[in-house]
Amino acid sequence: MPTVYGLHEIELQPGVEPEEYERFFAEEIAPSPMVPGWKVHLLKGERGARVGKFLVLLEIESVEARDRYFPNPGEESEEVTRFFEQHPEAAAALEKWNKMGPFGSKTDISTDYVAVAE
């Protein structure tokens, strides 16, 4: 099963400083529980068109693991709802995260890529 890489360009909300965003991610998102088969990474542009801008990289073990929680774009499964009910600290961190730089929303520029060769 090929790995899925979800790339999400992040634009910080007005008043959110990059250092604040990085600190929040490191202290609240990175240690939070994730749905099984998922890893989340915060990247910052160092060269190129998005220098200084953030990108969230979701590393998902397979298309099936993605679709288990998000069967269609913008649609959450009952299973992901239960996961966040069982992990309220992760739900609270995600809610705060979305206020800082919308992620997984209509304002999010994103694409899921499936590994075709490694």
Indicate residue ranges for each PLM-predicted region.
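Short, flexible turn/loop "capping" segments at secondary-structure junctions
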Residues: 1-4, 48-50
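An amphipathic, aromatic/His-enriched active-site/gating alpha helix that lines ligand/cofactor pockets
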Residues: 27-41, 49-50, 59-111, 115-118
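Active-site-flanking beta-strand signature of metal-NTP-handling nucleotidyl enzymes
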Residues: 3-11
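Residues on conserved beta-strands of the protein kinase catalytic domain
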Residues: 52-54
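Short, surface-exposed ligand-recognition loops at beta-strand->loop->(often short) alpha-helix junctions
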Residues: 11-23
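Short hydrophobic/aromatic beta-strand micro-patches
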Residues: 11, 57-59
